[in-house]
Amino acid sequence: MLTDKQVREVRSRFKIFQRKIYLNTCSQGPLSDAVQAGLEDYIASWHEQGSPWELWAEQYEAARKAFARFIHAEPEEVAIVTSASAGINSIASALDFRERRKVVLGEFEFPTMGHIWLAQRARGADVQFVKADGNRIPAASYEQMIDRETLIVPLTHVCFKNGFRSELGAITRIAHASGALVMLDDYQDCGTRPVDVEAMDLDFYVTGTLKYLLGPPGLAFMYVRRELISSLVPTVTGWFAQANPFAYDAQNIDLSPTARRFEYGSPPVPNVYAAMPGIQLLSELGMENVAAHIRQLTQALLSHVLALGIRAKTPADSAGPLVVLHSTDSNLLLRKLAERDIVASNRHDGLRLAFHVYNTMDDVEAVMEILKANIDLLAPAPATVGSHE
């Protein structure tokens, strides 16, 4: 667990907390002084040296190594891309849909996941969506659809709309028992608790820096299990995917033997500089401590919400950093929060409140004060005791 002193020290690194309560990390992490300094270092190198590509390449590889350590992978298993979409597209382009055609994914996926796999229908993919049961998708529902025709199971760890955490372990075991691959989109969870991709038995893992990794947009990381790399030949590619990008050979493709084969063009160097501080901060705090701190806050909020009879879209037993409440007018409720300098977000009828290392119990109490004053903008909980949508 983080100490009060540690949390205060973390908050002091983010200027926004001088004037606001920030509960929107599910959309974008706030800017820290360390990230700003990283960007200034990049600008200084550009000013002073013009094109110091050797220096920038060192930073690029340092980011790869730092993220690999963060998820307990090897640097050779990590690709650096400009977005989760770019990484997923690269993998999708490398798959062969002739023998196994099915792609099984839940209807809670972020749109980019659905769009990319639906686009593979042109290459023979049979895309099937697992229906939700209320605000959950049980592993048993995946089991009914995954079979020997299934090529890959793309899976979101935490749903962006309701905060539901998927039954990752069970779904992975079901998929692998049928010979299917598993891809985890961890954008809404990475940076909030420990990640060990080997222990999780994942084939692919993708996330980005702009949310709980406390970095900028425009940078994402993708893990590819080492045993798969050489067998996958992406058709979405570019010069930085080559074994030697600086061979400048336009007439031959010679892909890198590492996960770098899933990269595209020139790297987003400013974002690399800005990505490192967040990963470093979280690593220094210890991810077990970070997870315990977040869990304490989300459980406190859910307890208050249930006591008031407010309907939570987020199942209490699967809550991660994101708690979503059912609102009858989420746009108006957001404005009410903004009037009190509380930054949150909404998706359709859901008010999203996201917690991280810099949030406190005082933040929870401040939000609850606004919710109590505007309880008419929140849907009542179902009559069944302890139930959630």
Which sequence ranges carry the predicted segments?
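Pyridoxal 5′-phosphate
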Residues: 1-389
